[in-house]
């Protein structure tokens, strides 16, 4: 197993499948009366979040606690970071505390790589700028395999704001490694061809959502990150929804077995309607639940847990 999880590119097919298989074992813990394993007793996991996050931070905290690890949640607000402390000095503090693993979310792309150079423990990238979010890709792959029984050969449409999406980058890399066929869909300004080519030469690009729906096993809708863009990317929210939003009418053009995913948080009424988000095809709630199992697997394998 690798020492850090910084990018989906760190994972070959064998390692990725090992994580997914381990996650399936971890999922059985959720059904127990006592939802705990002693695997990481005595280990310390630090959640170092420089950006606000509800889903991801709580998911990692739950994962570590279910493995009996000691968890330290580091909040930037009110900390030395708010007073100007550098990432390196924070890393040295964590090193002195003996952190076995650091889960980091940071607004700067590449920050987890720097952190990995400064601490002896394992580093897990929980999202760095617009770069990557590998555990989200793993939980998405786990959800697809749970619903559809396989990953190899699946046709996956990743729709929306690819340009600003770390989730899209990690998913394209991981799904391509696992044999899925990925098509990026969205307005041309949000899918630069050079980005698609750099991510995975096998990924296709299409600017017409309606053209890809009948052939898609999975449609992954991305949040439109309006905080990272200006009005030049598309005319209006209404126009975006008309061209690239997934509503009930479009959902009915999907194959009968197809599923709809969204990493959250959603802009209901923009990239996805409530009819779709709350439908039986939607895996959005499952993705949250599966995230805990997948992150348990990642921490367990990175830290060499035992005594399951």
Curated annotation (Swiss-Prot):
Gene Ontology BP terms: 'de novo' pyrimidine nucleobase biosynthetic process; 'de novo' UMP biosynthetic process; amino acid metabolic process
GO annotations of cellular component type: cytosol
Residues that bind carbamoyl phosphate: 55-56, 105, 133, 136, 264-265
Pfam families in the cross-refs: OTCace (PF00185), OTCace_N (PF02729)
EC number in record: 2.1.3.2
EC class: transferase
UniProt catalytic activity: carbamoyl phosphate + L-aspartate = N-carbamoyl-L-aspartate + phosphate + H(+)
Pathway: Pyrimidine metabolism; UMP biosynthesis via de novo pathway; (S)-dihydroorotate from bicarbonate: step 2/3
Keywords (A to Z) from UniProt: Pyrimidine biosynthesis, Transferase
PROSITE patterns per UniProt: CARBAMOYLTRANSFERASE
InterPro entries membership: Asp/Orn_carbamoyltranf_P-bd (IPR006132), Asp/Orn_carbamoylTrfase (IPR006130), Asp/Orn_carbamoylTrfase_sf (IPR036901), Asp_carbamoyltransf (IPR002082), Asp_carbamoyltransf_Asp/Orn-bd (IPR006131)
Record-level Gene Ontology MF annotations: amino acid binding; aspartate carbamoyltransferase activity
Binding site for L-aspartate: 83, 166, 223
UniProt family annotation: Belongs to the aspartate/ornithine carbamoyltransferase superfamily. ATCase family.
Subunit structure: Heterododecamer (2C3:3R2) of six catalytic PyrB chains organized as two trimers (C3), and six regulatory PyrI chains organized as three dimers (R2).
Function text: Catalyzes the condensation of carbamoyl phosphate and aspartate to form carbamoyl aspartate and inorganic phosphate, the committed step in the de novo pyrimidine nucleotide biosynthesis pathway.
Protein name in the entry: Aspartate carbamoyltransferase catalytic subunit
Gene: pyrB
């Amino acid at each position: 197993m690798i020492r850090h999880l910084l990018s989906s590119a760190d994972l070959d097919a064998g390692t990725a499948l090992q994580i997914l298989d381990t996650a399936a074992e971890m999922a059985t813990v959720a059904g127990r009366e006592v939802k705990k394993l002693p695997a990481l007793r005595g280990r310390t996991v630090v959640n170092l979040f420089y950006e606000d996050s509800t889903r991801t931070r709580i998911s990692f905290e739950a994962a570590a606690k279910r493995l009996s690890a000691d968890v330290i949640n580091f909040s930037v607000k009110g900390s030395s970071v708010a007073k100007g402390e550098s990432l390196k000095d924070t890393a040295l503090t964590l090193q002195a505390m003996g952190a076995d693993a650091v889960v980091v979310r940071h607004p700067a792309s590449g920050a987890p790589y720097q952190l990995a150079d400064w601490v002896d423990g394992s580093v897990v990238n929980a999202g760095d700028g617009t770069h990557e979010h590998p555990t989200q890709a793993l939980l998405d792959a786990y959800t697809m395999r749970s619903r559809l029984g396989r990953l190899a050969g699946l046709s996956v449409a990743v729709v929306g704001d690819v340009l600003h999406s770390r989730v899209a980058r990690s998913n394209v890399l991981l799904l391509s490694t696992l044999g899925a066929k990925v098509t990026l869909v969205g307005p041309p300004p949000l899918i630069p061809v050079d980005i698609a080519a750099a991510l995975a030469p096998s990924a296709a690009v299409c600017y017409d959502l309606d053209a890809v729906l009948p052939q898609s096993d999975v449609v992954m809708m991305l949040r439109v990150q309006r905080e990272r863009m200006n009005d030049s990317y598309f005319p209006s929210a209404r126009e975006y929804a008309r061209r690239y939003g997934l509503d009930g009418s479009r959902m009915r053009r999907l194959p009968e077995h197809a599923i709809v995913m969204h990493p959250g948080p959603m802009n209901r009424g923009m990239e996805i309607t409530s009819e779709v988000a709350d439908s039986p095809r939607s895996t959005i709630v499952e993705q949250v639940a599966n995230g805990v199992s997948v992150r348990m697997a990642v921490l367990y394998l990175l830290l060499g847990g035992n005594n399951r």
